[in-house]
């Protein structure tokens, strides 16, 4: 999801993404070279 400023409602310029498999992650990291920004990968599963 995209993170928004609480006061203005505008995007803060970053977000969080969850991948169900490595194929989706591979697609994003490949396209990162085309200017989608920085990608960080954490392979630990988190439960909320």
From Swiss-Prot:
GO terms in the biological process aspect are: miRNA transport
Tell me the leader sequence span: none
Task: Note the Pfam families from the entry.
Answer: RRM_1
Taxonomically, the superkingdom here is Eukaryota
Q: Does the keyword rRNA processing apply?
A: no
In alphabetical order, the GO MF annotations are:
RNA binding
Q: Which InterPro entries match?
A: Nucleotide-bd_a/b_plait_sf, RBD_domain_sf, RNA-binding_reg, RRM_dom
Q: What does the UniProt keyword field contain?
A: RNA-binding
What is the name of this protein? Answer: Glycine-rich RNA-binding protein 2
Q: Which organism is it from?
A: Populus euphratica
């Amino acid at each position: 999801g995209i993170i928004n400023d609480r006061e203005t409602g505008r995007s803060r310029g970053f977000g969080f993404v969850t991948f169900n498999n490595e194929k989706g992650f591979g697609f994003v990291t490949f396209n990162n070279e085309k200017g989608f920004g920085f990608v960080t990968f954490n392979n630990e599963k988190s439960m909320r």
